A protein has these predicted regions:
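Short, flexible helix-loop junctions that flank or precede catalytic/ligand sites
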Residues: 1-374
Length: 374
């Protein structure tokens, strides 16, 4: 039987993102968004258990057998790190292994806009990177933390479940805490965080009221705080944070959020023309006008404010990003339309031949044929 390291080696060779192990099928690898089967026979329940247990510690085995679910990460020297979620399905063990490259990619390599570097340079406040699972949030955050690590002399504290990218001490002192290995829970780690003299705090996932409340408090007390949510737009992100609190607290939370928020980056990965994937970004920077809209519970007006904040503040809506990617011939029209939540607006943008690259205008020259053109 093929070993787990051999299968993970194949993930790297194929430039894949995930390895799926489950019964009654060969292992499958996600490559550029699509699952591909590995040559070989279907796996039995005994084989999936043997394969997945091969990298577990005794403590991890015990935890999995008690809860029937397990999140952890591990590294294979010279290859990469992997994040794993193990679970039971139809009474058998299954698992998904997500590739985490050993090398942290920088802003230029990821083609991230300058406004994200500006967010990483903030002395304090709350920066949120959001999007669905597998949209590259961890990769973007790793680039931002790496920039801080190289350029500042501060204490970076991360709380993750599990640790994905490993940051070495560079200009900064870096402490990375993994839930279950280094702390019992996010809430325990966050309660202790302010006693650990941090300057920058990364919260791997803002899952519940206590975690969100802690993030706001840490940002409010003068720390640069990064967090993630599974939301798809800036407005949805703000609403999600406010709605997690009881109704009687929401007015206070709107005010608190309006004061500490420094940026929201919502991202999605799309199939790239010619192979691979490319990131689409919605970026919101809270101007005084936007802070006022948050305070006054006029979240629905933020979208218009973002559209007019392109050149000066580096903001862009998701549709502006999609239009730009299409006009630069990086994605197909079908991909752009599939990813858009307002196809009529996107079609109009493309017909006008107008796009924006995070604060820099994209001219009409070289734009593909507008929608509806013959």
């Amino acid at each position: 039987m093929t070993t787990l390291p051999e299968l993970l080696q194949k993930v790297v060779e194929l430039q894949g993102s995930d390895l799926h192990i489950t019964t009654d099928t060969p292992p499958q690898i996600r490559v550029h968004g699509h699952l591909e089967r590995v040559d070989g026979p279907a796996m039995t329940a005994a084989e999936t258990k043997q394969l997945t247990y091969s990298v577990l510690t005794d403590a991890q085995k015990k935890r999995f057998e008690e809860s029937l679910e397990l999140d952890f990460s591990f590294g294979i020297k010279g290859l990469a790190r992997f994040r794993c979620n193990m679970f039971n399905q139809r009474g058998a063990v299954a698992a998904v292994y997500r590739l985490i490259p050993e090398k942290i990619r920088g802003f230029e390599e990821l083609n991230l806009p300058p406004v994200l570097a500006t967010l990483a340079e903030k002395p304090r406040g709350l920066v949120l990177v959001t999007g669905p699972t597998g949209s590259g949030k961890s990769t973007t955050l790793a680039a931002m933390i790496d920039k801080i690590n190289k350029e500042r002399k501060d204490h970076i504290l991360t709380i993750e479940d599990p640790i994905e990218f490993v940051h070495q001490h560079q200009g900064c002192l870096v402490n990375q805490r993994e839930v279950h290995s280094d702390t019992q829970s996010f809430s325990n780690a966050l309660r202790a965080a302010l006693r650990e003299d941090p300057d920058i705090v990364l919260i791997g996932e803002m899952r519940d009221l206590e975690t969100v409340e802690s993030a706001l408090r840490i940002a409010e007390t003068g720390h640069l705080t990064f967090g993630t949510l599974h939301t798809n737009s800036a407005a949805q992100t703000i609403n999600r944070i406010i709605d997690i609190f009881p109704a009687h607290q929401q007015s206070q939370i709107r005010t608190q959020l309006s004061l500490v928020l420094e940026g929201i980056v919502c991202q999605a990965l799309l199939p790239k023309v010619g192979g691979g994937r490319v990131v689409s970004l919605e970026i919101m920077v809270p101007t005084p006008a936007i802070r006022n809209l948050i305070r006054e519970d006029k979240i629905h007006q933020i979208y218009s404010a973002m559209q007019t904040g392109q050149e000066k503040f580096g903001m862009q809506t998701a549709n502006q990003s999609l239009a730009t990617l299409y006009m630069k011939k990086l994605i197909t029209l079908d991909s752009a339309m599939t990813a858009s939540s307002n196809r009529e607006e996107l079609q109009e943008m493309i017909n006008r031949g107008v796009g924006v690259v995070a604060g820099a205008g994209l001219g009409r020259a070289g734009a593909p044929r507008p929608v509806g053109a013959r």
